């Protein structure tokens, strides 16, 4: 009698892992999610008002929807029955495309211009403290201030020009390293091309830029020394004039305003024919406006005009050279990239030719082997005892046929002729196979040369793009040119040298 087995109850949960294991992973993920939200919220709250911090017990999308609701445009009814959307009132940036106007955020941390603001406040305090001299001292101080500002501008421009000169020198080193790297190509790839001409042209242009910027540096250095000597003369004359008015509580700017002369406030301004306000007194050796002061002010005005023209020329040259250097570098990189594409195209063509030749060589080799087998089959066995009956020349059928004169069978002669013809064909196939192998060797060598040339050009482009980055200084590029050699292994110190 059959026995009925009760059906096995299958659980609804088909997962294999233990629930505690899943709960631990879920708890860890939830903890990481909460930590991410908390850290992100704390980082954002440093740049947002207090009311922007969301409630941790409310969903993120609900908090965001409630927070940005006042930002949205409001629909207003017009008299004609039409509607018009207007942004909400108050400060903020109006986003017309998204129809929102977020309010202005207030930073709780010092802004990046905090240092400049404090420096400006300090300068204002110092300038306010320095206002306490008479008219001549005020004019000398004003001239000294403008000369100092011009000195700072000239110094900054010299720094910018020096940085650009360093970039030009670094570009020369990069050019030298590029030529050096391209020298490691195989002999078949070292034929002079447009990329070499571009590198030579780049070198000449960079040398011309270098000479031009060195001339600007020499000119600005001489002007800087002249401005410094003029500033020292103004400082000496100003201190000498201030000796008699140290106790007079009257600002220098106020004195210049009361004088009513714009050319005294700004010494680079050309004076008008109709003078309004106070007039410049004649130089008096025993008066307030001495010939030394007049000479210092005249020299300061002349140098200020000259330095402005020099600054404009230097800034224009620096900008032009920067753009020209960038264009030249891009053109050289473009020519190298074009050479890489051409090399890659030729390399692919050689690779396809090698593949086709490889198949032909395999077929010729197989055919040659089959011809050897065919020749062996045609020649037959080495021993007579191994011949088949139908191949023997003394078999009864042949002897009966050869009883009459002139009835010789041409079987042996034709076998010899076929064997000789097959041997000549085998020799011809072997000759062709040798030519194919020789040509494959040449193609492989040319393919490897193209590959090396492509890798060298790629390394040159990569080196140029990496070395022309502003963070790479001139010394690093110089060490790269002087110390690194791709074909020279690193120096290994011997034990004797270490002991010494």
Curated annotation (Swiss-Prot):
InterPro entries cross-referenced by the UniProt entry: Tektin-like, TEKTL1
UniProt main location, coarse: cytoplasm
GO BP annotations listed: flagellated sperm motility
Domain of life of the organism encoding this protein: Eukaryota
A family per Pfam: Tektin
Role of this protein: Microtubule inner protein (MIP) part of the dynein-decorated doublet microtubules (DMTs) in sperm flagellar axoneme, which is required for motile flagellum beating. Forms an extensive interaction network cross-linking the lumen of axonemal doublet microtubules.
Subunit structure: Microtubule inner protein component of sperm flagellar doublet microtubules.
Name under which the protein is recorded: Tektin-like protein 1
């Amino acid at each position: 009698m059959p026995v009925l087995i009760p059906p096995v109850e299958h659980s609804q949960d088909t997962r294999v892992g233990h629930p505690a294991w899943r709960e631990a992973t879920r708890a860890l993920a939830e903890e990481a999610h909460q930590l991410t939200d908390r850290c992100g919220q704390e980082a954002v709250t440093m740049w947002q008002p207090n009311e922007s911090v969301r409630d941790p017990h409310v969903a993120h999308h609900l908090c965001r929807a409630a927070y940005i609701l006042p930002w949205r445009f409001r629909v207003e009814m017009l008299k004609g029955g039409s509607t018009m959307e207007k942004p909400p009132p108050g400060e903020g940036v109006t986003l017309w495309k998204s129809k929102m106007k977020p309010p202005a955020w207030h930073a709780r941390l010092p802004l990046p211009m905090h240092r400049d603001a404090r420096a400006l406040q300090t300068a204002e305090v110092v300038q306010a403290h320095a206002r306490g001299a008479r008219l001549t001292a005020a004019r000398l101080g004003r001239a000294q201030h403008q000369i100092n500002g011009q000195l700072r501008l000239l110094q900054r421009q010299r720094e910018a020009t020096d940085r650009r000169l360093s970039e030009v020198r670094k570009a020369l080193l990069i050019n030298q390293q590029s030529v050096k790297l391209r020298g490691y190509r195989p002999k078949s790839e070292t034929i002079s091309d447009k990329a070499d001409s571009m590198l030579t042209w780049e070198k000449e242009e960079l040398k011309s830029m270098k000479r031009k910027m060195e001339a600007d540096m020499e000119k600005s250095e001489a002007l800087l020394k002249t401005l410094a000597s003029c500033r020292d003369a103004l400082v000496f004359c100003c201190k000498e004039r201030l000796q008699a008015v140290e106790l007079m509580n009257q600002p220098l700017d106020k004195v210049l305003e009361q004088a009513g002369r714009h050319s005294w406030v700004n010494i680079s301004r050309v004076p008008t024919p109709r003078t309004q306000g106070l007039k410049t007194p004649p130089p008096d050796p025993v008066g307030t406006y001495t010939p030394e002061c007049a000479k210092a002010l005249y020299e300061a005005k002349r140098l200020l005009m000259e330095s402005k023209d020099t600054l404009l020329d230097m800034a224009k040259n620096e900008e032009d050279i920067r753009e020209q250097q960038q264009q030249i570098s891009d053109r050289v990189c473009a020519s190298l990239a074009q050479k890489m594409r051409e090399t890659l195209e030729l390399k692919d063509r050689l690779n396809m030719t090698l593949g086709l030749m490889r198949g032909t060589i395999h077929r010729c080799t197989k055919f040659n082997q089959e011809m050897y087998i065919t020749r062996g089959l045609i020649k037959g066995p080495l021993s007579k005892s191994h011949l088949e009956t139908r191949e023997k020349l003394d078999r009864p059928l042949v002897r009966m046929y050869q009883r009459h004169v002139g009835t010789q069978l041409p079987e042996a002669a034709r076998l010899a002729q076929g064997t000789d013809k097959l041997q000549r064909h085998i020799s011809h196939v072997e000759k062709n196979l040798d030519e194919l192998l020789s040509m494959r060797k040449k193609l492989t060598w040319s393919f490897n040369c193209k590959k090396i040339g492509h890798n060298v050009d790629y390394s040159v482009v990569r080196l140029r793009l990496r070395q022309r980055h502003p963070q790479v200084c001139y010394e690093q590029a110089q060490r790269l040119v002087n110390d690194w050699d791709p074909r020279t292994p690193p120096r290994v110190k011997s034990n004797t040298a270490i002991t010494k």
